[in-house]
Amino acid sequence: MRSPLCWLLPLLILASVAQGQPTRRPRPGTGPGRRPRPRPRPTPSFPQPDEPAEPTDLPPPLPPGPPSIFPDCPRECYCPPDFPSALYCDSRNLRKVPVIPPRIHYLYLQNNFITELPVESFQNATGLRWINLDNNRIRKIDQRVLEKLPGLVFLYMEKNQLEEVPSALPRNLEQLRLSQNHISRIPPGVFSKLENLLLLDLQHNRLSDGVFKPDTFHGLKNLMQLNLAHNILRKMPPRVPTAIHQLYLDSNKIETIPNGYFKSFPNLAFIRLNYNKLTDRGLPKNSFNISNLLVLHLSHNRISSVPAINNRLEHLYLNNNSIEKINGTQICPNDLVAFHDFSSDLENVPHLRYLRLDGNYLKPPIPLDLMMCFRLLQSVVI
């Protein structure tokens, strides 16, 4: 017969093991008499994009490039050893203009996040001739910044957030490109000292008729190219400089051209008036019959007849209008009857080489009198 201790010892061992294990509490809804709740299906998890800390959160500046042979070269930029007067700081995620060495004449700062130009922006580099600030976020320019750059010739500030044309522009400026901003104001007299300006680009802004006063362009004696396309003009701008060669007014809301408007431009060779609201009623008979005009764009308007042209015009775009018929005798700059006798006189032959008439109400064939007049035509689209 076994001793009671033989039975007691295994029981003590089991009790000690049970005390060492944690006690599990029953889950809610799993007690006796209750049905277990179904487990929710796991929802698929997709990586969520990191939200910026603030709406204007910008990418960090890029790390400095390789060491330069020029000790004054900003770490954020590149100084080409074979072009010591140039400084390339473009596409570096910069928030402000770095310290520019005095030796720099050509400065490239496009494709950054610069928001303003304080007075000290170019204080060391007064010999700058070329500045490219395209595609930044510039809203504010200190008036004293540019007046301290007497040798500046080219200023590019396209694709920024300017609301008016900068003041105190250097008098030696030759090209001013301010397209794709928010410009709706032109300060009085801002161009008055820019006698050397050749190109003024103000396309894709918010310029209306009220912005242009009779003296807005005063001082631009040598301006050759004026671009006012993609604005909200309803009228032709007044007192455009008479030295103009190229005039861009596409994509406005212009309905009429004053009688004799272009007569005061002896050098005007290129006109673009596509995508406006021009009609025959708003076009005086000889609006474009000016001596030096070579290229005329009038597509995407509401014109129903071909306007009179000069003998030297080479390219005429009249596509996408309301033209129903075309008469070569009426639009020919020369008398067709006299033309037969002097067919070999190329000096008097109209110079038109390209004529576009598609998108109207015309149908082939091309009228014979049209071909007899414009004998140098190389392409007619109808």
From Swiss-Prot:
Pfam families: LRR_8. LRR repeats lie at residues 95-114, 115-138, 139-162, 163-183, 184-207, 208-233, 234-254, 255-278, 279-303, 304-323, 324-362, 363-382. Keywords: Disulfide bond, Extracellular matrix, Glycoprotein, Heparan sulfate, Heparin-binding, Leucine-rich repeat, Proteoglycan, Repeat, Secreted, Signal. It is found in: Secreted, Extracellular space, Extracellular matrix. GO terms for cellular component: collagen-containing extracellular matrix; extracellular exosome; extracellular matrix; extracellular region; extracellular space; extracellular vesicle; Golgi lumen; lysosomal lumen. The keyword Metal-binding does not apply. GO terms for biological process: cellular senescence; skeletal system development. Disulfide bonds join C332-C373. Residues 19-66 are annotated as: Disordered. Residues 1-20 form the signal peptide. Connective tissue. InterPro entries: Leu-rich_rpt, Leu-rich_rpt_typical-subtyp, LRR_dom_sf, LRRNT, SLRP. The keyword Phosphoprotein does not apply. Glycosylated; contains heparan sulfate. It comes from the Eukaryota. Its main location: secreted. The basic N-terminal Arg/Pro-rich region binds heparin and heparan sulfate. Binds collagens type I and type II through its leucine-rich repeat domain. Binds the basement membrane heparan sulfate proteoglycan perlecan and triple helical collagens type I and type II. Belongs to the small leucine-rich proteoglycan (SLRP) family. SLRP class II subfamily. This is Prolargin. It comes from Homo sapiens (Human). The lineage of its organism: Eukaryota, Metazoa, Chordata, Craniata, Vertebrata.
